[in-house]
């Protein structure tokens, strides 16, 4: 006696659904493996190259004005020009700089308004010259500011700080990383004697800056 097996449309639908699900799983697994491998390769390249932080040095700081409006209001008018070098020490990694803001400081007090520098790209082991003319108009300062400036004048020098904040992105081949915030801090010793009345007051020597990412 022969046997006849009959498969209902319902069973066929289930079988087809299983095949479609398996195909989707295979595609998902293939793409997941591909992207995981790609990310692993990028990570390994990153570890091998290990980008070094950029180097900054303040070559000159010139003070054109640093005056309190009145001794009672403690408002400061100032103008300072800064010149610094930026170096990318990496042999195979480029750097994009974005949203650069720079200002001058004295004893932890901001003595100029922030000035923005144009974004730029720095190639392997490249050195760039950056300049910024900073000004401040009626900036509030501490009550002791005038006294501190008088003491600095009697010593013949004043220490001015330069601070820069911004974002950078690493470039390895055609791959560009996400943005990292970085900060640069520099100190400059500027001649500031009693007999020095004609601006600008120039820095005595260049200084190496500290960079944090």
From Swiss-Prot:
One of the Pfam families matching this protein, by short name: LEA_2
Residues bearing attached sugar chains per UniProt: 67, 77, 195
Membrane topology (Lumenal): 49-213
Tissue expression as described in the entry: Expressed in the vasculature of roots, rosette leaves, stems, cauline leaves and flowers. Specifically expressed in phloem.
Membrane-topology descriptor: Single-pass membrane protein
Cellular localisation: Cell junction, Plasmodesma; Endoplasmic reticulum membrane
Superkingdom: Eukaryota
Residues in compartment: Cytoplasmic: 1-27
GO cellular component assignments: endoplasmic reticulum; endoplasmic reticulum membrane; plasmodesmatal endoplasmic reticulum
Induction line: Induced by senescence. Down-regulated by sucrose, glucose and fructose.
Keywords: Cell junction, Endoplasmic reticulum, Glycoprotein, Membrane, Transmembrane, Transmembrane helix
Native organism: Arabidopsis thaliana (Mouse-ear cress)
Protein name: NDR1/HIN1-like protein 26
Effect of a null allele: No visible phenotype under normal growth conditions.
Miscellaneous remark of the record: Plants over-expressing NHL26 exhibit slow growth, accumulate high levels of carbohydrates in mature leaves, have increased shoot biomass, decreased root biomass and decreased seed yield.
GO biological process, one term: defense response to other organism
Major localisation: other
Keyword Plastid: no
Role according to the record: Involved in the regulation of sugar, amino acid and some primary metabolite export from companion cells (CCs) to sieve elements (SEs) in phloem. Required for apoplastic phloem sugar loading in source leaves in order to transport it to sink tissues. Required for correct sugar partitioning between source leaves and sink organs.
TM stretches of this protein: 28-48
InterPro entries found in the cross-reference section: LEA_2, NDR1-like
């Amino acid at each position: 006696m022969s046997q006849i097996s009959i498969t209902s449309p319902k069973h066929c639908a289930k079988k087809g659904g299983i095949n479609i699900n398996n195909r989707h799983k295979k595609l998902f697994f293939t793409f997941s493996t591909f992207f995981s491998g790609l990310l692993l390769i990028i990570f390994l390249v990153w570890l091998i190259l290990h980008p070094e932080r950029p180097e900054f040095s303040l070559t000159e700081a010139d003070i054109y004005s640093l005056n309190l409006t009145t001794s009672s209001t403690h408002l400061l008018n100032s103008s300072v020009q800064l010149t610094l070098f930026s170096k990318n020490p990496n042999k195979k990694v480029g750097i994009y700089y974005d949203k650069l803001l720079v200002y001058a400081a004295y004893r932890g007090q901001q003595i100029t308004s922030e000035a923005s520098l144009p974004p730029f790209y720095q190639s392997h082991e490249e050195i760039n010259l950056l300049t910024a003319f900073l000004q401040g108009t009626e900036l509030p300062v501490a009550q002791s500011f005038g006294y501190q400036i008088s003491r600095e004048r009697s010593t013949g020098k004043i220490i001015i700080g330069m601070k820069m904040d911004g974002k950078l992105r690493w470039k390895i081949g055609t791959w560009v990383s996400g943005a990292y915030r970085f900060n640069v801090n520099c100190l400059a010793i500027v001649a500031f004697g009693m007999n020095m009345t004609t601006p600008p007051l120039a820095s005595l020597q260049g200084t190496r800056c500290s960079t944090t990412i």
